From Swiss-Prot:
ssDNA cleavage is inhibited by MazF4. Relaxation of supercoiling is stimulated by DNA-binding protein HupB. The record marks 48, 167-168, 171, 176, 183, 344, 547 as: Interaction with DNA. GO terms for molecular function: DNA binding; DNA topoisomerase type I (single strand cut, ATP-independent) activity; magnesium ion binding; ribonuclease inhibitor activity. This is DNA topoisomerase 1. The keyword Isomerase applies.
């Protein structure tokens, strides 16, 4: 590693007294320039200016013959990396060198984490300045912070640079040694990575659990009870309670069953079926129940710590439906424009000035009683103290309220505002008083025949909201649960009170498979396992999606069959490389390098070549990564790793998913015409998730003719029309006649070229309401007629068409696409209706209707329009295109009926349009000056 203080070998210096400040981005440069004044020139490097070669063509000619050239790391010379200036950054480097000639000092003002320190070091090594170099570090972009950083620079942190370089080299060695194994044994263009492969394994392991899961059924009774019979003033007079015990034995609930549907402790609980639950309810008919006990307890809930990187990603995913990548992109903008502090941090601590700012703001907005009696300090064990900046909070010594910044961040930047508001709420709430309330637990008894039954009800009321005035934590929709401020009121009852039974409902349940990971829950899992670092989570999640290992279904992360094959290969032949504890241990050792407690050369040598000790003990002692790959490569059976056994059919024949070059397919051996075992195959659509591939589904796919089901002839062309199951779902297509060609031409390959250059058959994906086994010729011809010309826009003269795409039905006018609510609209929408859609402002991101509906329902009897269920910011909702109504607790997307959907819409219309809460009259307080913004 070069000495950062090296001078006299590059450009710079003319006695002008000016300073050059280099940052990563133009936005950051403009902001700093506005604060530093004319004595400083602020320019950006636009990210990293050099890196390891990305491809063989990037390797300089003099190194191409070296055995290590493909790695870009000289493994025989202390793992010296080969850095090249990125082609697109050469002009930037030239500009920076030119600016150095007119200044007397260089300030490297890149971010203060590993990555920022590395960028600063690369700038130093590339520019080779002959003038004094200083490292300028700040964690928020406000005028006081920037001026303080310029007045108190520090030296470059070489330990931090070493840590980043070690990670970069490690990831290069891991990726460039293991990825070629995947190319040879699974498929081209795949990649392996130190963290991405483990993240993929976590998701695959969860899907395996779902595939092995067996649901268990159980019943109980939901009772609606009336307390007014013994207390006319009871409030509320009616409430619900659930059956919890019969004849002294606890009634089984979902948590009493394991993942295979077996009772964990069968002798301690009673499992009710529909018949026994119905009989118990009948036995209670005409009786009263009695309050056996009523226990009321106070509770208090402390506020949550301010955000760090991982918790911001999790909560933005849950509350705002942002991906981890989107969250970090918006946070980067907010930071660079001076709205928040640095967004890559493992810390939950606040500075003294930030604590005072939060407490002052809470007092002004909510009153003295809402502020914690003493400042709250949040500490946690930080993996790397050198990266432990302050928590993510609003920038400045006084915080700009959401109302104050709304005007600046509204409109096209509304997502920036929403994330700022979330950060502001969490920060202010962290210094507020506890939320307080009461819980009430009721135990209610009765007799069903000769058996004593026990019902239970639990209520919760909030007596003092405390920090919940500012911030309410949400829950992951796929996991279930209630938000912090959810209340359930019960009447205040005393033992011995009699209760009338209003209604008894035998209630059936089934255990659910473990929920798939969402981006939020995957980030939480990675953090709990100590795998990766919060600053890398968003890029890891993006990578595993870009590589085709994972795709999203709603907000859930679903693994592909390729991910199953890759994970299986790595587990079987490179088990330690995807072991959770091993990967976490590597992270800890890399942090030791950052702290200066470990030499990176020794560590890399043990990992790559082997040794007697070091982080990767099992890898080091087996000869290192290089030997591990060499030994295993030839022994890997490609067919075996690309074969995932599902189950046996009813004849005991194993059914496999095979991962082929054209996608996954099903296969089993059946008796052929000669009696010999013959492979039977079936196309496997990507739309079928692994846990949905049951024996019944497999048999249906095997029964589907692979050449497709013939529907008939197109009366216009005479071409045969068939329906097929494809990789991307069921579709219809036409069979074109073979082009004519004489034998001589065919022998020379002309026929093959004619076919390639000839007309392509028309195809059309089936609508969601269609089924491969029942689709008709008429349906197919309608699909093949798309896109349908709706008409011509009289204003622009452009043609408007209705089409069906990967993300659902949509309109297209030139380059402007607008989503439709239902697939039927493709064939029914009129020009006037289309023009109305185009007259509305185009909505962006989650506000747009680009995502297909979760489910299509029937027609709403009130509006006469089709109803669909869509995925919205606050969860699933039903809409007829005019009225939106959120699904309520107990409503299930898969089973909700047309009648229930219409009921929700009718109820929403009856309540009228949503109204904004009236502003409270605020006490007059002296106005605080917000941080200066340009």
């Amino acid at each position: 590693m070069a000495d950062p203080k090296t001078k006299g070998r590059g450009s710079g210096g003319n006695g002008s007294g000016r300073r050059l400040v280099i940052v990563e981005s133009p936005t950051k440069a403009r902001k700093l320039a506005s604060y530093l004044g004319s004595g400083y020139i602020v320019e950006s490097s636009r990210g990293h200016i050099r890196d390891l070669p990305r491809a063989a063509s990037d390797v300089p000619a003099k190194y191409k013959s070296q055995p290590w050239a493909r790695l870009g790391v000289n493994v025989d010379a202390d793992f010296e990396p080969l850095y090249i200036i990125s082609p697109e950054k050469r002009s930037t480097v030239s500009e920076l060198r030119g600016l150095l000639k007119d200044v007397d000092e260089l300030y490297l003002a890149t971010d203060g984490d590993r990555e920022g320190e590395a960028i600063a070091w690369h700038l130093l090594e590339t520019l080779k300045p002959r003038i004094p170099v200083k490292r300028m570090v700040f964690h928020e972009i406000t005028e006081p912070a920037i001026r303080a950083a310029a007045e108190h620079p520090r030296d470059l942190d070489i330990d931090l640079v070493d840590a980043q370089e070690t990670r970069r080299i490690l990831d290069r060695l891991y990726g460039y040694e293991v990825s070629p194994v995947l190319w040879k044994k699974v498929a081209p263009k795949l990649s392996a990575g130190r963290v991405q492969s483990v993240a993929t394994r976590i998701i695959v392991a969860r899907e395996r659990d779902r595939m092995a899961f067996r649901s268990a059924a159980y019943w109980d009774i939901l009772a609606k009870l009336d307390a007014s019979v013994s207390d006319p003033d009871a409030a509320p007079p009616t409430f619900s309670a659930r059956l919890t015990a019969v004849a002294g034995r606890r009634v089984a609930t979902g948590r009493d069953f394991d993942s295979l549907g077996t009772l964990r402790k069968g002798d301690e609980v009673i499992v009710l079926d529909e018949g026994s639950a119905t009989a118990l309810a009948a036995g209670l008919d005409g009786t009263q129940l009695t309050v056996a006990s009523a226990e009321e307890k106070p509770y208090a809930r402390r506020p949550y710590p301010p955000f760090m990187t991982s918790t911001l990603q999790q909560e933005a995913s849950r509350k705002l439906r942002f991906s981890a990548e989107r969250t970090m992109s918006i946070a980067q903008r907010l930071y660079e424009n001076g709205y928040i502090t640095y967004m890559r941090t493992d810390s939950t601590t606040l500075s003294e000035s930030a604590i005072n700012a939060a407490r002052t703001q809470a007092r002004q907005l909510y009153g003295d009683e809402y502020v914690a009696p003493a400042p709250r300090q949040y500490t946690r064990k930080v993996k790397n103290a050198q990266e432990a900046h302050e928590a993510i909070r609003p920038a400045g010594e006084t915080f700009a309220t959401p109302d104050a910044v709304r005007r600046e961040l509204d409109g096209p930047n509304i997502d920036d505002f929403r994330l700022y508001e979330l950060i502001w709420q969490r920060t202010v709430a962290s210094q507020m008083a506890d939320a307080r309330g009461m819980t009430l637990s009721l135990r209610i008894t009765g007799m069903s025949g000769h058996q004593e039954v026990v019902f239970s009800a639990t209520g919760r009321t909030l007596t003092f909201p405390g920090f919940l005035k500012a911030y309410v934590e949400t829950v992951d929709e796929l996991v279930g649960g209630e938000a912090d401020d959810a209340e359930r009121r019960l009447p205040h009852l005393t033992p011995g009170q009699r209760l009338d039974i209003v209604e008894l409902t035998p209630d059936g349940h089934a255990t659910n498979p473990p929920a798939r990971y969402t981006e939020a829950s995957l980030v939480k899992a990675l953090e709990e396992l100590g795998i990766g670092r919060p600053s890398t989570y968003s890029s890891i999640i993006k990578t595993i999606q870009d590589r085709g290992y994972v795709h999203k279904k709603g907000s859930a992360l679903v693994p592909s069959w390729v991910a199953f094959a890759v994970t299986g290969l790595l587990e079987q032949h490179f088990g330690r490389l995807v072991d959770y504890d091993f990967t976490a241990a590597m992270e800890d050792e890399l942090d030791e390098i950052a702290a200066g407690n470990e030499r990176r050369t020794n560590w890399l040598n043990n990992f790559y070549f082997g040794g007697d000790h070091g982080v990767p003990d099992s890898v080091a002692r087996s000869g290192g990564l290089k030997k591990l790959v060499g030994i295993n490569l030839e022994g890997i059976d490609a067919r075996e790793v690309n074969s995932i056994k599902l189950f046996d059919d009813t004849h005991g024949r194993p059914i496999y998913v095979r991962v082929g070059k054209n996608g996954p397919y099903l296969e089993r051996l059946v008796a052929g015409d000669t009696g010999e075992p013959t492979p039977q195959r079936a196309n496997l659509s990507d739309s079928i998730t692994p846990d949905e591939l049951t024996l019944q589904v497999a048999e249906e796919l095997f029964a589907t003719p692979q050449q497709g089901r013939t529907l008939g002839l197109d009366p216009e062309t005479g071409h045969e029309i068939v329906a097929r199951e494809g990789r991307f779902g069921p579709y219809v297509t036409e069979i074109l006649p073979e082009p004519a060609a004489d034998a001589a031409a065919a022998a020379q390959g002309v026929k093959k070229r004619q076919k390639a250059a000839g007309p392509k058959p028309r195809t059309g994906s089936l609508l969601r309401s269609m089924d491969l086994q029942t689709v008709t010729l008429e349906d197919a011809l309608r699909l093949l007629s798309l896109p349908r010309v709706v008409g011509v826009d009289p204003a622009s003269g452009e043609e408007i068409t209705a089409q069906n795409g990967r993300y659902g039905p949509y309109l297209k006018r030139g380059n402007d696409s607008r989503s439709l609510v239902t697939e039927d609209q493709i064939f029914t929408i009129t020009l006037d209706e289309a023009l109305k859609i185009y007259a509305e402002p185009k909505r962006r991101g989650r506000q747009s209707a680009s995502a297909p509906p979760l489910r299509e329902l029937g027609t709403d009897p009130a509006s006469g329009k089709p109803m669909v269920i869509k995925d919205g910011r606050f969860g699933p909702y039903v809409t007829d295109g005019e009225t939106n109504a959120s699904l309520r607790k107990g409503d299930d997307v898969a089973s909700i009926t047309d009648e229930r959907a219409a009921e929700l819409l009718a109820d929403r219309r009856a309540r009228g349009p949503a109204k904004r809460p009236a502003r409270k009259a605020a006490r007059k307080v002296p106005a605080k000056k917000a941080a200066k913004r340009d």
